[in-house]
């Protein structure tokens, strides 16, 4: 994923302008080599009028991050003009210079010190680096904050659908629409279960046949499953896909039981797996079961950060001796998460004994885990990292074995003592720092599932 950054060098002409230009050029090259798209003024920002001109250009071209490159000392009028022109997060970058006993040629550090003071007075958030232009650590910091800025911007226009209400007794799936809208800017659309059922019953047989043929190339045993409920699951996939497209929804939270079993005679799990994976779609539509809207929103966040599908799962076992946690959901995981060394299968729901669910072990690799939790009555972000292990799946359906950064016992203690929800979401890759930065941007408290502190 390429992030769009406003690169804004600040230069006071009373300092060493040639050296400042050299440092600016090196920093620019470093950012471009890292894959960032840079938006910058034709000339460095040298005074308040040029800062105001640059601010107008930024306001007309939304970006994920403002990088203020303090090429020399400058007063705070310029940084404030730039900060107030954009809602993008701020990153201040100062460069060290040798202690030569001679002229202080740039005085960059004092510049960001003054900038930080002014930004704090005016309640602007920021992060910073004090390092040479080609220091590799600065790229990691900038990438994390740009990802956070991009995520915040995209969520403000996100739309999520809730199909039905969560089952009685599953308070962990409670919808607090005002809280989600106020914190993230997302819009919620409510959808009646009967609309899904009516659409599913009216999907043309030829459409279902075509989808079945495509799915046969991914799952090797569909012909061995009971065919009527299998076709029912595929019709649910198309019904939900149509609704998401027509209502411009980025994700769905679906009351998956008991009505899909009792009214349609099939499982919704396989349909939601296909949607979450982007099967036959322009982009994945993350789906959570039990109408868990916070789970869907968490999955969408992980999907947009990783540019890959996310999965909402139960935590169903802890092996303290082996330091392992078992993750499982009926058959909901995206097919792209299947272990590449094992053929995924179509399966039947473990309790209702109806298709279609997915049946495969999760592939090995590093994962980021997250949950938008409201266990305390207000939102916070539960966040951790770990590794899915190349081990046999602990249960039928879509399942895997996880080793966390903290011990399995510590995780169990956190899960139960904090009264956390029974669902957590994951995606492959490390997006921990980006999520920490995102939480900081929106003042969202973080509960870490890790020994590490930041």
Feature-to-residue mapping (PLM):
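Periplasmic-binding protein-like
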Residues: 63-72, 91-93, 249-255
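N-terminal basic/disordered segments at the start of proteins
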Residues: 1-32
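Cap/lid and interdomain-hinge subdomains that line or gate substrate/regulatory clefts
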Residues: 1-5, 39, 98-225
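Long, internal scaffold/assembly segments composed of regular secondary structure
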Residues: 213-214, 218-305
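Short, acidic/small-residue loops that bind anionic groups at enzyme active sites
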Residues: 82-107, 116-121, 125, 273-289
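Extended hydrophobic packing segments that form well-structured cores
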Residues: 351-454
